């Protein structure tokens, strides 16, 4: 069983879609299928479909250090969330996470906050493990596992910006990821705290673009979950002490795939 960690996020990643190699020889696929059947007994139809296919398809980020980052040299996805994908694949195919990785039983596809939902809904991927914040609204569309990470949204600013707190952001430009929950979380927080802070928001397609735009001072602040921001801290910027919109990440599956959802939840819990 994978212990639930203390991590979460509001934002999205890049649009890279390079997938790990998925070809396996017939012997490997047959062995994996047999081992999975022995381990799981009579599998649910949605899980059996993955076993028969011979690979678990997972949507992940490609630009979030520590969570999921695509190695530009090897094309491999590396990080906590990718390791979790191998743990789940091991459960499905009746092997260890290391064996699942060695046998390439996970096919990764890079997703963003904007693309991860549609890819899951149209069946191109089986799971989303991509800093996907659990909300009541999203639970109406997807199955979510027990949370595996909890965090709060943060604010990254340049050292020479003169911005020292959220109150200094009135009239400033805040960059956020497309389809993230950051903007709504920020707005709700300042209303709750009765702060007179009305910034302008600009949406971007990925975190590297946000970091670059902050560095070139085209925006005044880069806002997303603090754990994600930590991967973009350097000598010229810092994260403000303010934190808001605490949230939880979960593994998402299509609403109809209840067997897969149950298997994932048991593994994550």
Predicted regions and their residues:
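Extended ligand-binding regions for polar small-molecule ligands
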Residues: 26, 35, 39-41, 83-84, ...
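Extracytoplasmic small-molecule ligand-binding "clamshell" domains
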Residues: 40-44, 48-128
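Acidic, polar ligand-binding/catalytic clefts
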Residues: 86, 98-168, 236-243
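A ligand-binding cleft/hinge motif common to bilobed small-molecule-binding domains
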Residues: 115, 129-141, 185-189, 212-246
